[in-house]
């Protein structure tokens, strides 16, 4: 995977050149919204966590409006194991009974969210932690998931997994105007106050649509989307995605990621990228340079 040179390897002249190279991107994206789905190794490796927080703060300071949506799969699995439960997934979605929902809300809305907020704030940002239950800004209903290769209407029960029905953007707009950085745990609320676990990629994609984001960036543990031979696919169209799903190249956790990315691209998000979160400062590379680090999803 591509690596950046260590800071000590870069001369002062080169540092100045790098800053100057970023200027066109800073001008282009000034006051634009970038929705970032934060997950994978970038959330567990201490150095990568620090790089991510610094990237987000820098993006805010140069005039962009970053909005962070995070996952927390490994942390959820750790706590489930402590209480004697085993995680189960169907078509990339976590099966969520009542006990699992308690664990998910505790981990995502508490432990993980507050750690991200704290890291960003340590580097000079003004991060605010939220779940979709705050101001009921992410409304959801129970997801009825269609079984694979089954007749229409033949659904599988995945418990308290939610499908987004409405996102109210006013809370995020209010925070942006105050120079705050929203950090969102993917938990929604039902009409009767039910709590729903929503896939973080789905939340990020829908939020990018509603906010009319300039970019949606999804961090992964791979260089991007790979073909069967393990080669990076730098650009994908809907037709190519259908072929990759049909032949089994795309499966599991990559399915909701690809689906959300494609929906966002089709619904007005100008640029959608699935990038390698294991690369230091991957956000700056993707947004403020020509050095892409992943796969771009095209709407056509």
From Swiss-Prot:
Primary location class: cytoplasm
Subcellular localization: Cytoplasm
Site positions (Transition state stabilizer): 37, 257
Domain of life from the UniProt record: Bacteria
Keyword presence, Flavoprotein: no
Enzyme class (EC, first level): transferase
Residues reported in the UniProt entry to bind substrate: 72-73, 94, 197
Metabolic or biological pathway, per its Swiss-Prot or TrEMBL entry: Amino-acid biosynthesis; L-arginine biosynthesis; N(2)-acetyl-L-ornithine from L-glutamate: step 2/4
InterPro entries: AceGlu_kinase-like_sf (IPR036393), AcgluKinase_fam (IPR004662), ArgB (IPR037528), Asp/Glu/Uridylate_kinase (IPR001048), Glu/AcGlu_kinase (IPR001057), NAGK-C (IPR041727)
Gene3D superfamilies in the record: Acetylglutamate kinase-like (3.40.1160.10)
Gene Ontology terms describing biological process: arginine biosynthetic process via ornithine; L-arginine biosynthetic process
Pfam families, sorted: AA_kinase (PF00696)
Role played: Catalyzes the ATP-dependent phosphorylation of N-acetyl-L-glutamate.
Cited PANTHER family: N-ACETYLGLUTAMATE SYNTHASE, N-ACETYLGLUTAMATE SYNTHASE, MITOCHONDRIAL
The family this protein is said to belong to: Belongs to the acetylglutamate kinase family. ArgB subfamily.
The protein's name: Acetylglutamate kinase
Gene assigned in the entry: argB
